[in-house]
Amino acid sequence: MAARLVIGLWLARASASDELGLRVEWHAPFVSGGGYCSEATAFAEALADANVSITAVPHGDGYSREYFDGLPAEAQARLRALLDGPGGDRARRRRRPLVAVCHSEPGAWHVAGGPNWPSSPCPPRGGAAAYVVGRTMFETDRLPNGWAARLNAVDEVWVPTEWARGVFAAGGVDGARLRVVAEPVDVAYFDPAAAAADAARADVRAALARLARPPATERSDGTSVFLSVFKWEPRKGWDVLLEAWWREFTADDDVLLVLLTSEYHSTADFEAQVDELRARLLGGGGAAARAPAPVRIETKVSHAVLRALYAEARAVVLPTRGEGWGRPHVEAMSMGTPVIATNWSGPTAFLSERNGYPLRFDGLVELPADHAFAGHKWAQPSVAHLQERLRAVVDAPEDARARGRRAREDMVAHFAPDVLAHDVLGHLRRIEASLHVPAGDTPEL
């Protein structure tokens, strides 16, 4: 808490007496939903709060009315303000050098021969930007074809983890261009204290009580609710999760697994795929004689319900095969809910035995031959170790709660938006110095 207070005071002093002599255009899929969207919004809001002259520019993906309408009213208003850009003396601001941040999949960038699909121009046309930053990430052990050329065509590249820095450098990106800038999480919204006062929390608790076994009228207070939040794709390891779940638990265990998912280049018939896997796993002998532990599938919930689900879960389980960062991971941890997640790729930047349950993996395996990134490798999460980690949460709830408390502390101390704004401001001031912006170009307040 003391560290955050110092940073807050530093930002206040900076905004009052040392305003940045740059203007920033942050190009990202601000109205599409998804990981890049939430990350870019958190960065832009934090920088605006630090008095950086920043404008949000939609880029890299389509517009989702469903996503925008699902935002709380305050979040909608903040996003509109970012898209409109700062008020005041716009003519004077336009005289400042422009830093353009291209925050998306690099195939959308207007570099190295142009974008791979129609997208708004980033960098802006006509050489309007004095400096171009690329922000991106990936989830396998190497870069897709063509990425290195695109990444080397911008002035510098911000990646979220040291793991990513190594992968990008090995993939041909100039190491001098690479900077590690972690991803912020909204610790004010994803706060267990805020969720406790939310009406959605009571509704979710009642719904979970109806779903659990035994039924609500007989349900004990000790039911262990596990949550997994993911897009329905092989990379997310839902097959690993369900195999470990049904091998470890039956209907005799006081447990419930909630899958909060959405289609991603896949069928939306999630129930059929779950039923097929259950029949294959439990269809012959042994566990077949036992009723399977319950699984509930949910889709398209509000932000308030998502927060309430995090709050009600004993743990969030994410045995994925690779992550650029891990947005559900840090949201859950910010809520004080421990995470079971594969100990490879993005989550290694923030997950430890101290604040969660790192999951072992059985080496790296090649992606299927028909996959878009065939030849790449990702992790194969251990089913046996996942069973152990699930059981540990059930058998030692106090330890799980302690890990969750430390997870919340770590998110607030290291990944809160104001903490990351401080980091980004440092990079922007370095860029400002490299551009030799005269002191007189910084307007008085």
What role is predicted for each listed range?
Residues 392, 399-414, 430:
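A short, well-ordered alpha-helix in the C-terminal region of glycosyltransferases
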